[in-house]
């Protein structure tokens, strides 16, 4: 086994946001949680080093995971990546295991498989990337698969600038290596910071062997700006879409479909173009038609859309919800709502038909109220159901009716004013042609 230290102390100034960088989301999930999930898949000893907005990050983490060990970087004294793993006396932060893997919190695309070279190595090692265009990166000079030296681009000679091996920002160390060289680390550089790369240089100077392990570039994309966040999200989306299609989900124009990490599929599902699945959703034996949005809801044995919106806590089972229908905290069981309706805070029973333009008036300006509709109910078009209201089964509601009282089962309900036709009434407003 090994211990994992995740570095998350940076300010993330290039994100231009008051939200801590690591809490920015990738497909609905804060990017920090991706790396924590990977860390816990390989270790029972996970450490998180914080500084900037640490209480906010700690609170977010504790809502999801109780197993993380938190540390605060002493930035005022030991800044930089090397300083992140130092205690007050320059010794490494204590870990449970002899081998330590160091990761960055702003790399949400890292997977257990991508870390395999570092996990399998028993030596001190640095993860490398092979970049076609390494401009802007420090170069790693190799000799017989060992690190000879690490050169910052501004210090590289012409030959070294042609090197395409760069530091991926992940490391595997023996704890005794950290205990030996971390106290020797200094900040005698332009930035006045302690660097993990300098730690490696100290080891090389004393003939320590540092393995150079090449990793998959895509998985080690660092997120330091909104542009890089968007790029990482595109890659994650491709993974989520592929995972869904591997389960048999049919996607029409997959590149137009957005889904988040919390979405799960069962049975035979079809997603048409422009569909958005947000939060923790269950899509089971369902057809989600074009440009529909499903948020934190369950769609089971049903069709939804096109242009429908299932807002949080909607449970749509054995039902049809058509175009321009919005649901919110609604439970439909064997019902139909074909078009142009708002169904909020309601329960609708089997074989009930909701006509076009029907609205559940669930909000009185202060509180939300519930509408309960039984089975075999026909609600005529353009009716309003003013909650709280209870409509029994086998009920017929005439078109244009405003319901303000409970309706017993077996009833016909109407509330329209009589129609009046006034002869020549038009010409009271307009001149005769």
Swiss-Prot record:
Region described as Pyrophosphorylase: 1-226
Pathway the protein contributes to: Nucleotide-sugar biosynthesis; UDP-N-acetyl-alpha-D-glucosamine biosynthesis; N-acetyl-alpha-D-glucosamine 1-phosphate from alpha-D-glucosamine 6-phosphate (route II): step 2/2; Nucleotide-sugar biosynthesis; UDP-N-acetyl-alpha-D-glucosamine biosynthesis; UDP-N-acetyl-alpha-D-glucosamine from N-acetyl-alpha-D-glucosamine 1-phosphate: step 1/1; Bacterial outer membrane biogenesis; LPS lipid A biosynthesis
PROSITE patterns linked: HEXAPEP_TRANSFERASES
Similarity section: In the N-terminal section; belongs to the N-acetylglucosamine-1-phosphate uridyltransferase family. In the C-terminal section; belongs to the transferase hexapeptide repeat family.
State the Gene3D superfamilies in the record: Hexapeptide repeat proteins (2.160.10.10), Spore Coat Polysaccharide Biosynthesis Protein SpsA, Chain A (3.90.550.10)
- Cofactors: Mg(2+)
The entry's protein name is: Bifunctional protein GlmU
- Record lineage: Bacteria, Pseudomonadati, Campylobacterota, Epsilonproteobacteria, Campylobacterales
A Gene Ontology biological process noted in the UniProt record is: lipid A biosynthetic process
């Amino acid at each position: 086994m090994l211990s994992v230290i995740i570095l998350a102390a940076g300010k993330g100034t290039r994100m231009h946001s008051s939200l801590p960088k690591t809490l920015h989301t990738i497909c609905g999930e804060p990017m920090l949680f991706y790396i924590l999930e990977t860390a816990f898949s390989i270790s029972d000893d996970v450490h998180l080093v914080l500084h900037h907005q640490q209480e906010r990050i700690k609170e977010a983490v504790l809502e999801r995971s109780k197993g993380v060990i938190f540390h605060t970087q002493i930035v005022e004294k030991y800044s930089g990546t090397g300083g992140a793993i130092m205690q007050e006396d320059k010794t490494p932060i204590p870990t449970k295991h002899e081998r330590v893997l160091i990761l960055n919190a702003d790399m949400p695309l890292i997977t257990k498989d991508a870390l395999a070279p570092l996990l399998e190595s028993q030596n001190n090692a640095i993860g490398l990337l092979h970049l076609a265009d390494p401009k802007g990166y420090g170069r790693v000079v190799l000799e017989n698969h060992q690190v000879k030296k690490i050169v910052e681009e501004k210090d590289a000679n012409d030959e070294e600038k042609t090197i395409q091996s760069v530091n991926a920002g992940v490391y595997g160390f023996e704890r005794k290596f950290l205990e030996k060289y971390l106290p020797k680390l200094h900040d005698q550089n332009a930035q006045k910071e302690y660097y993990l790369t300098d730690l490696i240089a100290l080891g090389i100077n004393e003939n320590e062997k540092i393995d150079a392990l090449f990793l998959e570039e895509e998985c080690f994309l660092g997120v330091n700006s909104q542009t890089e966040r968007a790029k990482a999200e595109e890659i994650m989306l491709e993974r989520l879409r592929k995972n869904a299609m591997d389960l048999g989900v049919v996607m029409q124009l997959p590149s137009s479909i957005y889904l988040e990490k919390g979405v799960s599929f069962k049975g035979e599902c079809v997603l048409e173009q422009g569909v958005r699945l947000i939060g923790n959703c269950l899509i089971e034996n369902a057809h989600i038609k074009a440009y529909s949005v499903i948020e934190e809801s369950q769609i089971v044995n049903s069709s939804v859309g096109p242009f429908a919106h299932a807002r949080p806590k909607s449970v749509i089972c054995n039902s049809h919800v058509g175009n321009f229908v919005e649901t919110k905290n609604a439970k439909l069981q064997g019902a139909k709502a074909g078009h142009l309706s708002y169904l909020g805070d309601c329960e609708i029973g089997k074989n009930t038909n909701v006509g076009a333009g029907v609205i559940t008036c669930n909000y009185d300006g202060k509180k939300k109220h519930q509408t309960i509709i039984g089975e075999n109910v026909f609600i005529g078009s353009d009716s309003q159901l003013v909650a709280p209201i209870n409509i029994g089964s086998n009920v017929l509601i005439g078109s244009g009716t405003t319901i303000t009282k409970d309706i017993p089962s077996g009833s016909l309900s109407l509330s329209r004013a009589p129609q009046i036709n006034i002869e020549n009434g038009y010409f009271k407003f307009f001149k005769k042609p």
